[in-house]
């Protein structure tokens, strides 16, 4: 699965073992730079059979999570071989460091001051790493091996975000929980946001109103206060739309939010649609109103809003890899980009669409979230009732008695 992340001058994309930076400037127009991720370096002797078992399969994605820092200067990339790569945009995307992670990452984010990067993993832990050391240089490989454990869940973490001024760290997991913890003292839990009936896959923080939006495996989107109060909720798709899909899994994959127009976009697993909502505020509270449902050619890989509040949809389509939509106040909905009104976005879009050789590496690659996120329901009651009925009816099975042997008969006669 390919990813799409926006920074002030363009977009950072990942596909396979490579990154592609699409950068726009008035002098040079749109430029493209490809970066290949560094392979792990380990001088310790290892058993060849063990290496073969740990090697990722061809249908697994190599990049598991990416994040751009608030200013757009730094890019963090976590891969399937348990490495954290940091790049500096101001130094022409120079790699600052590559650090070894204890477990495979599921989500990564930066603090607001950009001094630290937080990595959530499959075992439910969040580790903190320094971006730059006190001397202004990236830390050496030996120093980078150490990491500060911030918090831990008893279930796989799926997303992590930080709130305004890094006051709280919010994490969500496979077991329907959203946890709001104080930062940096994350052992001090502020509250839980409980209400989802499936795994919680994506979080969005609204800075202006201090609200949290979550998307779950049951297909529901919920809006919360940071005190754990649920403001509103909505279902992504109705039953008719669900039945039209080939598969039953309709969990929310990714959420993206436009702060300027209060517009929320959501994509789901195994669904070729983008659901767009308008977040409205009134005296009675907060509400999510569906604005439009955008039909795509394929199931989207990723979505994001740029700094011009335009929605970018990345999909596995050779002739139309990325679609761009802009908000229309007249129609109160997202509409296809008008190239005359945004020549800059159109130039970037054309460059991305002409880079199918880069994106095709992700075609057919499954998302890093495993199919086992949904809990398997075990019907123990059926077996219990059957055994109970056997006891009531007196049909309880008894072990068969073996036929008496000659020695047994002789012993019985003597006695």
Show which residues each predicted segment covers.
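Conserved strand-to-loop turn within each blade of WD40 beta-propeller repeats
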Residues: 15, 78-81, 120-123, 171-175, ...
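Short coil/turn segments that connect the beta-strands within blades of beta-propeller domains
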Residues: 8-9, 71-73, 113-115, 165-167, ...
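Terminal intrinsically disordered, low-complexity extensions flanking WD-repeat/beta-propeller proteins
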Residues: 231-415
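Intrinsically disordered, low-complexity acidic/Ser/Thr/Pro-rich linker and tail segments
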Residues: 1-65, 69, 354, 358-415
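Canonical WD40 repeat/beta-propeller blade segments in eukaryotic WD-repeat proteins
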Residues: 1-3, 56-68, 103-110, 155-162, ...
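Contiguous mid-protein beta-loop-alpha structural module that forms a pocket-lining wall or clamp
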Residues: 194, 199, 206-224
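Per-blade loop-tip surfaces of WD-repeat and WD-like beta-propellers in eukaryotic adaptors/scaffolds
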Residues: 23-32, 47-50, 81-98, 122-148, ...
């Amino acid at each position: 699965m390919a990813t799409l992340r926006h920074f002030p001058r363009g977009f950072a994309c990942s596909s396979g073992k490579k990154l592609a930076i699409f950068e726009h400037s008035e002098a040079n127009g749109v430029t493209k730079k490809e970066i290949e991720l560094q392979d792990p370096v380990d001088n310790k002797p290892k058993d060849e059979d063990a290496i073969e078992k740990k090697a990722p399969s061809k249908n697994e994605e190599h990049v598991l999570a990416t994040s751009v820092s608030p200013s757009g200067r730094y890019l963090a990339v976590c891969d399937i071989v348990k490495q954290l790569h940091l790049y500096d945009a101001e130094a022409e995307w120079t790699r600052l460091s590559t650090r070894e992670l204890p477990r495979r990452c599921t989500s990564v984010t930066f603090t607001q001051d950009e001094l630290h990067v937080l990595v959530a993993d499959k075992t439910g832990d969040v580790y903190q790493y320094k971006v730059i050391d006190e001397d202004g240089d990236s830390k050496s490989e030996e120093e980078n091996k150490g990491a500060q454990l911030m918090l831990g869940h008893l279930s796989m973490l799926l997303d992590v975000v930080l709130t305004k001024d890094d006051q709280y760290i919010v994490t969500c997991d496979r077991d329907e929980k959203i946890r709001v913890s104080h930062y940096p003292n994350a052992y001090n839990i502020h509250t839980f946001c409980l209400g989802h009936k499936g795994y919680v896959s994506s979080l969005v923080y609204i800075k202006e109103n201090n609200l949290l939006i979550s998307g779950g495996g049951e297909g529901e989107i919920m809006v919360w206060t940071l005190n754990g109060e649920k403001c509103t909720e909505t279902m992504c798709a109705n039953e008719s739309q669900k039945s039209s899909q080939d598969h039953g899994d309709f969990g929310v994959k990714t959420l993206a939010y436009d702060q300027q127009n209060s517009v929320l976009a959501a994509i789901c697993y195994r669904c070729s649609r983008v659901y767009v909502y308008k977040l409205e505020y009134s005296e009675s509270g907060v509400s999510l109103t569906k604005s439009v449902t955008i039909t795509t050619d394929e199931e989207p890989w990723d979505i994001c809003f740029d700094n011009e509040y335009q929605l970018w949809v990345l999909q596995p389509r050779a002739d139309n890899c990325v679609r761009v939509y802009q908000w229309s106040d007249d129609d109160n909905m997202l509409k296809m980009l008008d190239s005359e009104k945004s020549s800059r976005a159109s130039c970037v879009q054309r460059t991305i669409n002409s880079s199918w050789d880069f994106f095709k590496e992700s075609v057919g690659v499954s998302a890093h979230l495993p199919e086992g996120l949904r809990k398997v329901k075990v019907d123990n009651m059926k077996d219990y009732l059957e055994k109970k009925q056997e006891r009531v009816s007196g049909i309880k099975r008894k072990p068969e008695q073996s036929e008496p042997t000659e020695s047994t008969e002789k012993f019985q006669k003597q006695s």
